[in-house]
């Protein structure tokens, strides 16, 4: 399932705190992104059609919850990035970020620890 960048903003709000009403979603994501109520409701509608979120009636309103786990979404997006730009290989991605001093000492330490863990 492909979730657009704008839709992912709504998903992030739901992953942080769900269930949420459309009003709560609008309040959380509308202002910071300069989106109207209509824009946010269109995004919610698209996510419902994609079955990325569910709606449960709660009186005269609906409560929205994510059906896609954030971890699964991140895994899929990460793999898509690797496939599109680095032929599915992680090493060229890390090399790309290491060029130009984009990795902090903390990043390097975390990568070393990960490699050590994988090597066991």
Regions found by a protein language model. Name each.
Residues 20-29:
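Short acidic, hydrophobic short linear motifs in intrinsically disordered regions
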Residues 8-13, 24, 92:
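Pre-recognition alpha-helix immediately N-terminal to the DNA-recognition helix
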Residues 41-45:
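Short, hydrophobic-biased segments on the C-terminal half of alpha helices
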Residues 14-18, 31-32:
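Short helix-capping/hinge SLiMs at alpha-helix to coil transitions
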């Amino acid at each position: 399932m492909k979730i657009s960048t704008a839709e992912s903003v709504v998903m992030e709000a739901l992953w942080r705190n769900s269930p949420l009403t459309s009003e709560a979603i609008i309040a959380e994501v509308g202002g910071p992104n300069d989106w109207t109520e209509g824009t946010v409701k269109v995004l919610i509608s698209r996510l419902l059609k994609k079955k990325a979120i569910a709606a449960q009636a709660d009186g005269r309103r609906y409560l929205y919850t994510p059906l896609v786990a954030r971890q699964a979404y991140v895994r899929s997006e990460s793999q898509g990035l690797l496939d599109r730009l680095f032929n599915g290989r992680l090493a060229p991605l890390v090399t790309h970020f290491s060029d130009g001093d984009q990795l902090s000492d903390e990043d390097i330490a975390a990568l070393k620890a990960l490699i050590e863990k994988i090597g066991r």
